[in-house]
């Protein structure tokens, strides 16, 4: 290969000289799924038209996780707040749906409208320790992306409320125990996140422990089970897409921004459905006219505000950790929710619940160790690659072809 051809390699691979990937994207979702197109560069040699050099950059287009991950101070604060607001929202939802005979679609509408209005205030009015910065540019498929994520978000909320209305809290959380494995698959397909064998194996006690927590749950309902499983899949897909938007290199959204845009998109998509299919004055299962007393309105507004805080803290935490780590943290939250439901709603404690909790705790510890080992291994590989960059690129070109040209 000529000297001119060799000089092109560092220029193309320089991180500061990133260009948009050439070629046409498939439909309008190419930028979301095509994470590898921005990491691979083809360069032609001057000596032969058949000669080509493949350069793979090390920098990912999506920052999967920071160095400390969930153990950073800010991530721990977000995690604690997310747990707290999630518990408050969960039990208030159960109270409204069970004791007040509320409809899931009505409660979902209140939650989405509330979080949209509060998010609008936070975006356009400087408040709540958040100063919104005006964005100069948006992704080319911004509207379609937000509509898609917003639809998934609303579907997750409504399906979760349907499962909560038809089955016990503990059973709904048990069905969600398979979330980590769905997240591993989707994160690999969409973000290109690599999880090693040890990390994948550590997820088994996490999922199995949560399933054991309520293995004797007898309030099985096919509608509630189907809704809980659908919520699980939709939530994993939404989390992976949200991570792509929160941690992208070129277009990165803050947690309040993403929360507001997706909520507004969900409301815009589903206003016709609410108008034609919901009978607002009659929302009780018994069909009686619902009385909007001051206490009921206060409960609904409180539920909407708590749901907003839960969503914002979840997005903020998601921006700091990987989707798989977020899924493991969510599994821990589900296990704690089971024990809190036992305390609050008086469900019986079983030996399997205790064993399951121990397994979840052990699985989380194993996951942290496996994750740390994987990060150290990858860091050592990157260090070795940076010390001898030419040794990694030379074998990509046949030795004899460089001698003849």
Swiss-Prot record:
Transmembrane segments: 76-96, 106-126, 142-162, 167-187, 195-215, 219-241, 264-284, 296-316, 326-346, 347-367
Keywords: Membrane, Transmembrane, Transmembrane helix
Listed SUPFAM superfamilies: Multidrug resistance efflux transporter EmrE
Region Disordered: start-end pairs: 1-22, 380-405
The keyword Ion transport belongs to this UniProt entry's keyword annotation: no
Name this polypeptide is given: Solute carrier family 35 member E2A
Gene Ontology BP annotations: blastocyst hatching
Pfam families per record: TPT
A Gene Ontology cellular-component term: membrane
Top-level taxon in the UniProt lineage: Eukaryota
Function summary: Putative transporter.
InterPro entries noted in UniProt: Sugar_P_trans_dom, TPT_transporter
Signal peptide start and end residues: none
Topological category with respect to the lipid bilayer: Multi-pass membrane protein
Subcellular localization, as worded in the UniProt entry: Membrane
Predominant localisation class: membrane
Family as reported in the entry's similarity comment: Belongs to the TPT transporter family. SLC35E subfamily.
């Amino acid at each position: 290969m000529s000297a001119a051809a060799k000089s092109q390699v560092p220029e193309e691979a320089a991180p500061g000289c990133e260009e948009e990937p050439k070629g046409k994207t498939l439909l309008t979702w190419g930028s979301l799924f095509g994470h590898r197109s921005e990491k691979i560069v083809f360069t032609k040699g001057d000596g032969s038209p058949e000669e080509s050099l493949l350069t793979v950059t090390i920098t990912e287009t999506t920052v999967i996780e920071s160095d400390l991950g969930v153990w950073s101070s800010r991530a721990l604060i977000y995690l604690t707040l997310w747990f707290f607001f999630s518990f408050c929202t969960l039990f208030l939802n159960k109270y409204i749906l069970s004791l007040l005979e509320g409809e899931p679609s009505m409660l979902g509408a209140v939650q989405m409208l509330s979080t949209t209005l509060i998010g609008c205030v936070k975006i356009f009015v400087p408040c709540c320790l958040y100063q919104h910065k005006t964005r100069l540019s948006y992704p080319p498929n911004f509207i379609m992306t937000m509509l898609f994520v917003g639809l998934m978000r609303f579907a997750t909320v409504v399906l979760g409320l349907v499962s909560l209305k038809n089955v016990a809290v503990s059973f709904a959380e048990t069905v969600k125990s398979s979330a980590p494995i769905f997240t591993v698959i989707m994160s690999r397909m969409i973000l290109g996140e690599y999880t090693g064998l040890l990390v994948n194996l550590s997820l088994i006690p996490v999922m199995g422990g949560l399933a054991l927590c309520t293995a004797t749950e007898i309030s099985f309902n096919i509608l509630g089970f189907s809704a809980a499983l659908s919520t699980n899949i939709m939530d994993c897909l939404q989390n992976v897409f949200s991570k792509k938007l929160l941690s992208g290199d070129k277009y990165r959204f803050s947690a309040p921004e993403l929360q507001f845009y997706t909520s507004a998109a969900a409301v815009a998509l589903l206003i016709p459905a609410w108008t034609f299919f919901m009978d607002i004055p009659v929302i009780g299962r018994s069909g009686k006219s619902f009385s909007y007393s001051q206490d009921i309105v206060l409960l609904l507004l409180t539920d909407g505000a708590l749901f907003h805080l839960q969503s914002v803290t979840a997005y903020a935490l998601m921006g700091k950790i990987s989707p798989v780590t977020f899924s493991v943290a969510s599994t821990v939250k589900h296990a704690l929710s089971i024990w809190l439901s036992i305390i609050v709603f008086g469900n019986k404690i079983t030996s399997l619940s205790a064993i399951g909790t121990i397994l979840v705790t052990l699985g989380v510890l194993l996951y942290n160790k496996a994750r740390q080992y994987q990060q150290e291994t990858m860091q050592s590989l990157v260090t070795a690659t940076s010390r001898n960059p030419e040794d990694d690129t030379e074998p990509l070109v046949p030795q004899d072809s460089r001698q003849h040209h």
